[in-house]
Structures are given as structure tokens and as C-alpha cells.
UniProtKB/Swiss-Prot annotation:
Residues 428-452 are annotated as: Zinc finger-like. It is found in: Cytoplasmic vesicle, COPII-coated vesicle membrane; Endoplasmic reticulum membrane; Cytoplasm, Cytosol. The gene is Sec24a. This is Protein transport protein Sec24A. The keyword 4Fe-4S does not apply. Residues 8-28 have a biased composition (Low complexity). It comes from Mus musculus. Residues 194-236 have a biased composition (Pro residues). Gelsolin-like repeats lie at residues 963-1036. COPII is composed of at least five proteins: the Sec23/24 complex, the Sec13/31 complex and Sar1. Interacts with TMED2. Interacts (as part of the Sec23/24 complex) with SEC22B; recruits SEC22B into COPII-coated vesicles for its transport from the endoplasmic reticulum to the Golgi. Interacts with STING1; promoting STING1 translocation to COPII vesicles in a STEEP1-dependent manner. Interacts with TMEM39A. Interacts with SACM1L; this interaction is reduced in the absence of TMEM39A. It is a peripheral membrane protein. Its main location: membrane. Keywords: Cytoplasm, Cytoplasmic vesicle, Endoplasmic reticulum, ER-Golgi transport, Membrane, Metal-binding, Protein transport, Transport, Zinc. GO terms for biological process: cholesterol homeostasis; COPII-coated vesicle cargo loading; endoplasmic reticulum to Golgi vesicle-mediated transport; intracellular protein transport; positive regulation of protein secretion; regulation of cholesterol transport. Zn(2+) binds at residues 428, 431, 449, 452.
Length: 1090
């Protein structure tokens, strides 16, 4: 039965420019999604890569009215308003097609081959039709860009068993934070300390002797001839001429001049064998400081709330490396291991087994690899794939109806991180992959890349292992023993001297802003954390305030007090005395402190109600553009003056109407300014503190496209809303003190045959696959969609590698590399067995946000539901033998319907008029920028009973005992009036206390005598000297650790105003506009059985 075409999809081609930004003067469109590879398509036409065919019919209709009891709240048609045109594109030095963020367009299927001639995608689903396979992306159909241009015969990657015995003294290099010291003793000496910290850098000397005696090393071909060095034009930070692979391979270690970060990351220093003296005694010292025991950083960090405990499947130390080819017998043995995991082979009837939620945090599936390979794999907290068994062909992926993609948390805080300071960074000469645990050493002199299969020479320096102080063991080097590693980049990876840490604060000081009292909190937090700002002696700081005019503050050393400089012409902003506005923090610290102490009182009597945010941002950009850095902007109302002025668009009675909802920006000013900031290595973080509509859909662009962050505090007031004050202070502390990387770029590579075509997150896509990140922080997550471009029948393993090149706050250029290895499978059953339901749900959420913005909220909701229907239909028709009653799902997808239902009830996609527009936009911002673990906790909260906490099964972390109560289903059935239940919703904690809760809990934890004495607005637990109070305080403190947003706590009585929010989060129960979990399962079953 054909489904009518969704109105939002009509006119897709006509509104292309409106949905993807604007075209530059050269005809290159600013887009939010995939772009052409300029290597393959140097000529760009105005219509290139876009599929303007109308969407086809969809064979399985999903009427919105069947999902929502109130059809008037769920039937949305029509398209969104158009965007604006960018008038001043970024300067480029070649035919580049920049792409911004992840571009929303009216269709949102799963990734697939980008064939322009393919059948158009049905608009009501993420998933393809049956025959022929249509293109599966939520974007227009660009030709996909494979990461490699050189194809080589495949040799299976090696197996990596064993564990070396390290006996020498070794030392760590810190990961950017102040070094901690310890030493590891030789055998026979004292035992090492428990949980040893990291010592300072150690530079090993030359090898103790000549290379081991034996036959001559394998002969190598003649070294390529060197070419004359190229002249280096002036740096252009928003230029990305050279694509991946277009770099001279003739350097052979010589220093080359580079003019773009794209070239530096994609083709920088070529680690090839050099003409060196073969006598190590007379040659220069090789090697450098390495971690003494390439540490098991994956397992050393204390468990994070909401994440499963670290699995023993991930490395905890250096692993011995026996290079034996992985043959068919190895894979057969690996596949036979499936019988050891009967749970994975289970088929579940969800209508009979509804309680499938585990009582402990859900663990990601372990890839079906040999143990020797898996123990070297990347930690899934950092890098994970939606399918841990990669389909061999695109046809098999289409048949599974599951998305293929990656979710990354590349800059996550790590307790221990192996850092390599060698002058030689070994990379593939063809695809520029960094050497990693999954390459294959053909012999001691040659290694085969696991992404493009090119055979590379092993540099002479790489033959010496400073860990073991043995020559001739390249496979035991730290680079080949750790899936996550950081390199200290040599000067060849720099376009200019590393930029200093620059922090510019921009404050709204209008009457409305002063009334909220936020300036007192922010200035006090800055005073408290001024010495903790990441940086060094070069750190610079500056301040701008604005209302209807713009105020600068001269902090020149030698002044007795700060001087205010006022610019009243907001139509032509200029910078007065620019050399005195951004000052060295150490040299002008007293003036900075004086300003922060007096600033809140300077505007207490202001009557100015206008807000010139746009001109203030222009001024801030001009001030920070020579160096780059971070702008922190605080805004409390809708901008009303100058460029970027906005008008109210919210209709309270039509907040979820497809025709009236305003999820798209009303102006392109903030997007254009963000592009300019990105080009000058400046990021903008937005703090919105407003009780009124402020058009976050427009304002948020300034952070989204400059790799910044958005913080939102609705109804902030220093007296009327103390919870928001606490939240702001806690989040400012983390924001000001967390690790930061400047002028960063990130590239994701994958094995030949796979293709990345869409990115999600806060960044600017500078070239085909290079993400520009002026700032990178530990709380940022990213996602990508992929397709199988070429058949993987000739390989048994595929690998993915992300490389993040950044400048630390200490002025060091570093490269953090993560490598993930996964098996390739040829059957549909194996694909389903390896499905990662959390990663799938997270990727679909990102895709649904784009669909909401570019089509309609109704389209996004229907597509989420259809994703479940299509995948379970494929499993039923292609894997199950015979028709079985009920809703049969593979064990790996047992929580898929539950997570999708939770997404439908999340603020981003919830129907009804109770969600304010800015709140919905902020929820969508979180979906697009949060790491997966935090996104899933926001989507599907964790519920615990806490009135009977005990030490049984507790965690012991740093002499703290952390109770671990079981996780309960999100249903009122699990509540009881004689208990107390804590819900962890990521950025919110709600403690629901039953009317008949025990007197012991009331007195020993809440500090009240009876239930009626619980305050209506209780937001903190008293610190009582009782075991019960200590247990729950430790548990809540543990939950709050390492969260990007501080979760405030509300204590809820049965009569509390917050009770509605608590019940709304019980996603398995029916609400006025959404089905219960059981009703949703019945609906899914009805659609699957059609």
C-alpha cells in the first residue's frame, strides 16, 4: 500500500539554498552535510550532487494518528521557512566546497552509496525501499567520497597475542595536565604504588648497542627522489586546498612548508626511512619519552555514572605482538565463539518479555574478534560503531534496515593517556593513516596499512623500542600497542607558532540582565577560578559589555584602575586601543580582579532596555581575530538593535504545529559570523539566561558553526530561582577549568570500501572530510553516517581512525588518535547480532533533529517509528524461520522500541504545546553535541530506589564507598508510597518521596520529622552525620561527576509542582499525548505483521 508523499518533501530542490545555507561568490554552497570530493569532481555546477526527484511512495504507512491519541497534536504538514543567503563567504585558496555542521534536508534515511542516479528516498522513513535500493542518506545525494585514492591488494591484519615483560625504569608523559610523579621499579625492587600517577618526561639515550647480529635486513626499493620545496604562501586559516592524499611523498623526512591545516593533517611530515648512520652508537639518539606501561587508561578511570564498568576486553597494558596473518581458519574460530554467548543468539518476544531493561548500566556489545585483537581495541566510551559487525556489502546493509555510523567522544578526559614524543610520527605514505595496533608487519622493515593496504617501510628510528630498550621490535612500540595514543607534534604540523590561550568575555548589561543578577554570579565565579584557567604565561583575557552601546575595558599594565571605553555607533563598530583590551593575565591580574569586583555595581541603576548583541559580537570578533581563542557570550533577552536584531516568533498555542513551529534561524547573520570566527580559529560559547523567548534557533548558530557550546538557563533569577544560580555556578566552574584545545582539526579515516558522507556535531566542515574545531573540549561528542561504497568481500576486518590535531593550553601541538577495528560479516543474522542499540538510537536522534528542522516534527517522529518497524520487519522476514506470533526481535535489539519511544517523549520530539520553543531547540542542541552516554541518559533516564541503600555490591573509589542500587523500569508500577526513588535524567535529578516513606529515611536523610515537613522547594539534601545520609550523598556525588551539565536536585512530594515532570519521564507509561510502552509494542507488531 503506497503512502502519500509528505508535504514537507515537496519543493526540496527549489528550497535547497534555503536549507543548506547560501552560496558563496564562487558558486560553492555553504551546506550542512556532505560535499563533493574536489579530487574527483573539480568542476562544480549549480545543481551538482543534488537529487531533485520527488520522493517515491513508501510501502508501509505509519499514520501519526495511530501514535497519538490526540491527532490534532500530531499531524504536521508543510515545509519550514527558508533560510537566508550568505553574502561574504570565507576566503579560500582553491575550489573548495565547505560544509557546515550536519546539513538537514527533507529526507533522512540511513547511510548508503551516494549514487546520483539511484531511486529517490521515500520521505516518511529513514530506510530504503525494497527494490531497487535507493540512496540512504538524510541529505541530498552527493557522490560519496571514499577516504582513500590508492587501492592495494589486501593482506589480512595481524593477530596480537601476548604481553611483554617490562623490567626497565620507564616514565609517562602527562596528557596535558600538570605532571604527577612516580616511578616503576625493576624486578626485585620495592613494589610500585597503587594507582601510580604520571612522572615527567624522560628522554632515553641511544640504544645500548648495535643492532642484533644476523642476516641483512630485507632489501628496500630506492628512496624516491626529493623535489624542490614549495614556497609557502601566507597562512590562510580558512583555506583547505589540498585534499586527502594530495601531498608530496618525496620529502622523505625533510621539513616541508604547509599553507593549510588540511595539508598538515592530511599530508604533513612523512615518516619514511632516512639516510642515517647504521651504527646506533654514532647516530643521534632515537626514540623519545614513552609511557612506561602504555597504560590501560580504559580501565584506570573510576566508573562514570550511567556507563557500564570497564570491560576486561580492553587493554590494560602493553600487549605482545605476534605477527601472524589472520586467515580463514582464524575467522572461523572467531565465529564459532558465538556459541559461547547464547544470550546473543536469543530471539525475544517483547509482548511476553517486557522487562528487558538490565538492572545495571547497559554495556555496549563486544565485537566478535579474536581476544588478541579485541584487547587492543578502542574503548567504546571514545569510539563506537552502530554495527559491531560491518556488513560486507551495501545491499546487505540495506537489507538490515539499520544505520551504519560512528559516535565519537575524541577529547574525553582520560586519567592516563600514552603520549609519544618521538620526532618521527609513522604514517601511511598513501592514505596518511597513523600506525596503530591493527597494521600488519610483513617483516621488521615493512608494514601494511590496515586502511588502504599500502606496504610502507619502517623508519630506522621506529626499530628501537625505548620501553624495552631493544632494537628490532617495532611491533612492541607504544604506537602499535595502544588504540588510543597522543603524539607531540613536531614543527611540521604547525602553520604558525601555537596560539596563546585567549579568553574574551562578552556580557549583556541591559536593564533586564541586571535584574536577573547573573553578573554577580559570573564575576564571582571568574574571580574564584581565575588562577585555574587553562593556560600558561602567555594567557590573555579581555572583557566587553553591551546594552544599546558597546563598552570596552582597557587593562593596560601600569593603570591604577580599568578604563571604560564606550562605542555608541553600533552600525560601524571599531576597536579603540586594541592593544590594551586583550592583555596578559599574569601581567594585569590585579586590574582584571578589580574589574570583576566592580563590574556588577557599575550598571545597577541602568534603565537601558535595548540589546545590541550583533554589533557586540562583531566587535568581539574584530578584537579576537588576530590570535583566535574563545568567546564566552552571556545574553538575557532577544537582541533588538543593530545587525542580528530579532523579532518574537513563538506562538504559545502553536508550539508544535508543522506550519508555525520555528526551528530554523530567522537570519543568517549569526551563521555568517560563526564562519568568520571559525576561519580565525575563534569559537563562541553562548550562555542564554532568559525567561522570555530569545530565538535560540537563530542565536545558537553562532556556537554551532564555530565549534562552541550552548548553555541555557530558563527563568534565571538570583532570588526567585536559586536552583538555576547553583547550576550556573557549578557549570561555570567546569567550563572555566576543564581542559581545552585550540585551533583544532579532526579527520576520520576508514578502510577502503567504506565511505563517510554526513557529520553531526558543532563544527565547520572545512574540506571533504576535515572538521574545523577552533576549540575542542572534553564534553563534546560527534557522530557520522557511513555507507559501504565497495564490496568488502576481500577483507575480514575493517578499521576506523580519528585523528584530532590541536594546540594544548600549554602551547604544545598534539595529535590524539583513536583506532577501532571491527569484523566484516556476510549474513544478515550476524549483522543483527552485532547491533549496538544505544549507538543506533543516538545516531537516529541526530538524524531526526535534522529532519525536524528541514521537514517537520511529524516527519521526524514518523521516521523514528519507521526505523523500528523496518528493521524488525527485515529480521522477521529474512532471519526468522517461519511466522511466529508476537513481536520477535533479536536480543541485541530488545531495547530498540523502548529507546525510540523514549526519544518520541524527549523534549526534542515531544508533541503538545507545553514545551517552550527555546527549550525544544536547546534539547536539540544537546542531541547534536553531547557524547552518547549523556545523550542516552537524557533520553532514557535511570530510576533507582534509594531509601534502602546498602554497601552490598558498592564501588570503592578513592576511599569512597559508592552504593550501586539496581536500575528500575521507568513506570509508575515500580514506585511505591513507602519508598523513595531517585531519577537521573542527565541534567536533572529528581528524588520522589512516597507519602508513607519510612521515618528512618525522613529523619536520617532528609532531616525532617514527618512527611508534611518536607519543604515544597527542597533542592539540597542536608549533610547529616548518619550512614544513610553519607551513602546517598556519595551516590549523588558520583552521578554528578564528569557531566557536561550540572544536574540539579529536586526533592518531590506527591503535591509538588515538579511531580508532573517526574511522571512525564516515566516513558513506559501513557501520557495525554503519547502511547504507553505496551501500546507502542502493539502498534509496532501490527505494522511488522503487515
Amino acid at each position: 500500500m503506497a503512502q502519500p508523499r509528505i508535504p514537507a518533501a515537496r519543493g526540496a530542490a527549489a528550497s535547497l539554498q534555503a536549507q543548506n545555507g547560501a552560496a558563496s561568490a564562487s558558486g560553492s554552497p555553504y551546506t550542512n552535510g556532505p560535499v563533493h570530493n574536489t579530487l574527483m569532481s573539480p568542476q562544480v555546477s549549480s545543481s551538482q550532487g543534488y537529487d531533485s526527484q520527488p520522493p517515491g511512495s513508501y510501502p508501509r504507512p505509519m499514520p501519526a494518528k495511530t501514535l497519538n491519541p490526540f491527532s490534532a497534536q500530531s499531524n504536521y504538514g508543510g515545509s519550514q521557512g527558508s533560510g537566508q543567503t550568505l553574502n561574504s563567504p570565507l576566503v579560500t585558496s582553491g575550489p573548495v566546497l565547505p560544509s557546515l555542521h550536519s546539513g538537514p534536508v527533507p529526507r533522512m534515511p540511513l547511510p548508503t552509496s551516494q549514487n546520483p542516479a539511484a531511486t529517490p528516498m521515500p520521505s516518511g522513513s529513514f530506510l530504503p525501499g525494497a527494490n531497487p535500493p535507493p540512496p540512504l542518506n538524510w541529505q541530498y545525494n552527493y557522490p560519496s567520497t571514499g577516504p582513500q585514492t590508492n587501492h592495494f591488494p589486501h593482506v589480512a591484519p595481524p593477530t596480537l597475542p601476548g604481553n611483554p615483560n617490562l623490567t626497565a625504569d620507564h616514565q609517562y608523559v602527562s596528557s596535558g595536565d600538570p605532571a604527577l610523579q612516580t616511578s616503576f621499579k625493576k624486578p626485585g625492587s620495592a613494589l610500585p604504588l597503587q594507582n601510580p600517577p604520571l612522572p615527567p618526561t624522560f628522554q632515553p639515550g641511544a640504544p645500548p648497542g648495535p643492532p642484533p647480529a644476523g642476516g641483512p635486513p630485507p632489501s628496500r626499493g630506492p628512496a624516491p627522489q626529493k623535489t624542490p620545496p614549495r614556497a609557502a604562501p601566507p597562512p590562510s586559516f580558512n583555506s583547505a586546498v589540498n585534499q586527502e592524499g594530495i601531498t608530496s611523498n618525496a620529502n622523505n623526512g625533510s621539513t616541508a612548508a604547509h599553507n593549510t591545516y588540511d595539508e598538515i593533517e592530511g599530508g604533513g611530515f612523512l615518516a619514511t626511512p632516512q639516510l642515517v648512520n647504521q651504527n646506533p652508537k654514532t647516530s643521534r639518539s632515537v626514540g623519545s619519552a614513552y609511557p612506561s606501561l602504555p597504560p590501560g587508561y580504559q580501565n584506570s578511570a573510576p566508573p562514570v555514572a550511567g556507563m557500564p564498568p570497564p570491560s576486561l576486553s580492553y587493554p590494560s597494558g602493553p600487549q605482545a605482538f605476534t605477527q601472524t596473518p589472520l586467515g580463514a581458519n582464524h575467522l572461523t574460530a572467531s565465529m564459532s565463539g558465538l556459541s559461547l554467548h547464547p544470550e546473543g543468539l536469543r530471539v525475544v518476544n517483547l509482548l511476553q518479555e517486557r522487562n528487558m531493561l538490565p538492572s545495571t548500566p547497559l554495556q555496549p556489545p563486544v565485537p566478535n574478534l579474536l581476544e588478541d585483537i579485541q584487547k587492543l581495541n578502542c574503548n567504546p566510551e571514545l569510539f563506537r560503531c552502530t554495527l559491531t559487525s560491518v556488513p560486507q556489502t551495501q545491499a546487505l546493509l540495506n537489507k538490515a534496515k539499520l544505520p551504519l555510523g560512528l559516535l565519537l567522544h575524541p577529547f574525553k578526559d582520560l586519567v592516563q593517556l600514552p603520549v609519544v614524543t618521538s620526532s618521527t610520527i609513522v604514517r601511511c605514505r598513501s592514505c596518511r593513516t597513523y600506525i596503530n595496533p591493527f597494521v600488519n608487519f610483513l617483516d621488521q622493515r615493512r608494514w601494511k596499512c590496515n586502511l588502504c593496504y599500502r606496504v610502507n617501510d619502517v623508519p630506522e628510528e621506529f626499530m628501537y623500542n625505548p620501553l624495552t630498550r631493544v632494537y628490532g621490535e617495532p611491533h612492541k612500540r607504544p604506537e602499535v600497542q595502544n588504540a588510543t595514543i597522543e603524539f607531540m607534534a613536531p614543527s611540521e604540523y604547525m602553520l604558525r607558532p601555537p596560539q596563546p590561550p585567549v579568553y574574551l568575555f562578552v556580557f549583556d548589561v541591559s536593564h533586564n540582565a541586571i535584574e536577573t543578577g547573573y553578573l554577580n554570579s559570573v564575576c564571582q565565579s571568574l574571580l574564584d577560578n581565575l588562577d585555574l584557567l587553562p593556560g600558561n604565561t602567555r594567557t590573555k583575557i579581555g572583557f566587553i559589555t553591551f546594552d544599546s552601546t558597546i563598552h570596552f575595558y582597557s587593562l593596560q599594565e601600569g593603570l591604577s584602575q580599568p578604563q571604560m571605553l564606550i562605542v555608541s555607533d553600533i552600525d560601524d563598530v571599531f576597536i579603540p586601543m586594541p592593544e590594551n583590551l586583550l592583555v596578559n593575565l599574569n601581567e594585569s591580574k590585579e586590574l582584571v580582579q578589580d574589574l570583576l569586583k566592580t563590574l556588577p555595581q557599575m550598571f545597577t541603576k541602568t534603565l537601558e532596555t535595548q540589546s545590541a548583541l550583533g554589533p557586540a559580537l562583531q566587535a568581539a570578533f574584530k578584537l579576537i581575530s588576530p590570535t583566535g581563542g574563545r568567546m564566552s557570550v552571556f545574553q538575557t533577552q532577544l537582541p533588538t538593535l543593530g545587525v542580528g536584531a530579532l523579532k518574537p516568533r513563538e506562538e504559545p498555542n502553536q508550539r508544535s504545529s508543522a506550519k508555525e513551529i520555528h526551528l530554523t534561524p530567522s537570519t543568517d547573520f549569526y551563521k555568517k559570523l560563526a564562519l568568520d570566527c571559525s576561519g580565525q580559529q575563534a569559537a563562541v560559547d553562548l550562555f542564554l539566561l532568559s525567561g522570555q523567548y530569545s530565538d535560540l534557533a537563530s542565536l545558537g548558530c553562532i556556537s554551532r558553526y564555530s565549534a562552541g557550546s550552548v548553555y541555557y538557563y530558563p527563568s534565571y533569577h538570583h532570588q526567585h530561582n536559586p536552583v538555576q544560580v547553583q547550576k550556573l555556578q557549578k557549570e561555570l566552574h567546569r567550563y572555566l577549568t576543564r581542559k581545552i584545545g585550540f585551533e583544532a582539526v579532526m579527520r576520520i579515516r576508514c578502510t577502503k570500501g567504506l565511505s563517510i558522507h554526513t557529520f553531526h556535531g558543532n563544527f565547520f566542515v572545512r574540506s571533504t572530510d576535515l572538521l574545523s574545531l577552533p576549540n575542542v573540549n572534553p564534553d563534546a561528542g560527534y557522530a557520522v553516517q557511513m555507507s559501504v561504497e565497495e564490496s568488502l568481500t576481500d577483507t575480514q576486518l575493517v578499521s576506523f581512525q580519528s585523528a584530532l590535531l590541536y594546540t594544548s593550553s600549554k602551547g604544545e601541538r598534539r595529535i590524539r588518535v583513536h583506532t577501532l577495528c571491527l569484523p566484516v560479516v556476510s549474513t544478515l543474522n550476524e549483522v543483527f547480532l552485532g547491533a549496538d542499540v544505544q549507538a543506533i538510537s543516538g545516531l537516529l536522534a541526530n538524524m531526526a533533529v535534522d529532519r525536524s528542522v528541514t521537514a517537520s516534527l511529524s516527519d521526524a517522529r514518523d521516521a523514528l517509528v519507521n526505523a523500528v518497524i523496518d528493521s524488525l520487519s527485515a529480521y522477521r522476514s529474512s532471519v526468522l524461520s517461519g511466522q511466529q506470533p508476537g513481536l520477535m526481535v533479536p536480543f541485541s535489539l530488545r531495547l530498540f522500541p523502548l529507546f525510540v519511544l523514549a526519544l518520541l517523549k524527549q523534549k526534542s520530539f515531544q508533541t503538545g504545546t507545553s514545551i517552550r520553543l527555546d527549550e525544544r531547540i536547546f534539547a536539540m542542541c544537546q542531541v547534536k553535541s553531547q557524547p552518547l552516554v549523556h545523550l542516552m541518559l537524557t533520553t532514557h533516564p535511570s530510576l533507582y530506589r534509594v531509601d534502602n541503600l546498602s554497601d552490598e555490591g558498592a564501588l570503592n573509589i578513592n576511599d569512597r564507598t559508592i552504593p550501586q542500587p539496581p536500575i528500575l523500569q521507568l513506570s509508575v508500577e515500580k514506585l511505591s508510597r513507602d519508598g523513595a526513588f531517585l531519577m537521573d535524567a542527565g541534567s536533572l535529578l529528581m528524588l520522589w518521596v512516597g507519602r508513607n516513606c519510612s521515618q528512618n529515611f525522613l529523619s536520617q536523610v532528609l532531616g525532617v520529622q514527618n512527611y508534611a515537613s518536607i519543604p515544597q522547594t527542597m533542592t539540597d539534601l542536608p549533610e547529616l552525620d548518619t550512614p544513610e545520609s553519607a551513602r546517598i550523598a556519595a551516590f549523588i556525588s558520583w552521578l554528578r561527576e564528569q557531566r557536561p551539565f550540572f544536574p540539579v536536585l529536586y526533592v518531590i512530594r506527591e503535591e509538588s509542582l515538579m511531580k508532573a515532570a517526574f511522571l512525564q519521564s516515566l516513558v513506559e507509561d501513557r501520557t495525554e499525548s503519547a502511547l504507553s510502552y505496551y501500546e507502542f509494542l502493539l502498534h509496532i507488531q501490527q505494522q511488522v505483521n503487515k
